């Protein structure tokens, strides 16, 4: 299966929305934060209504299928993730969200209130929330003030973030002698 590296281009929009989805492509669910600490989703406090999750993980293969049924993987290098994260906020897209990438299900009263790129394996804030992901991972915190959306979180109908964006792709020629992870450490 072909693998493509995602490239941020100034001519493209980059990430312009982050959807709430049941099955995130990065295969990691968000956690919900209570007033005192991280708790199971079923016991979430109504007070804070914060969702914390990785948005993109560097060099993690993400399975895709195009309109013609061709299967392939994409990866986001660290430098692309950093540029996409910065551009997302620079363009003022922190209120752009929907359910399952459906433009008819645009969300109101949700905002990305915090975001960071993991830079430290020992002291990064993500560790406090139970995430053990590589440096270069983009994390975000969404404040949910919409009752209907919060109910979907509590019911487990949405479990993570998934980006919407426009990027260029560059095909990668993988060595037959090395595993995917070895080539992108």
State what each model feature region is.
Residues 1-185:
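Signature of dsDNA virion morphogenesis modules
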């Amino acid at each position: 299966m072909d693998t493509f590296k995602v490239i941020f281009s100034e001519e493209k929009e980059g990430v312009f929305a982050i959807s709430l989805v049941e099955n995130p492509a990065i295969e990691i669910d968000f956690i919900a934060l209570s007033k005192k600490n991280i708790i199971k989703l079923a016991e979430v406090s109504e007070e804070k209504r914060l969702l914390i999750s990785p948005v993109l993980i560097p060099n993690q293969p993400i399975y895709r299928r195009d309109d013609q049924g061709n299967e392939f993987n994409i990866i986001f290098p660290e430098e692309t993730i950093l540029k996409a994260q910065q551009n997302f906020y620079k363009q003022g897209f922190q209120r752009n969200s929907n359910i399952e990438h459906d433009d008819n299900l645009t969300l109101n009263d949700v905002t990305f209130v915090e975001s960071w790129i993991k830079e430290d394996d020992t002291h990064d804030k993500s560790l406090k929330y139970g995430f053990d992901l590589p440096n270069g991972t983009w994390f975000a915190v969404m404040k949910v003030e919409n009752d209907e959306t919060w109910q979907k979180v509590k019911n487990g109908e949405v479990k993570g973030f998934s980006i919407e964006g426009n990027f260029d792709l560059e095909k990668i020629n993988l060595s037959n002698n090395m595993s995917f992870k070895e080539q992108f450490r």
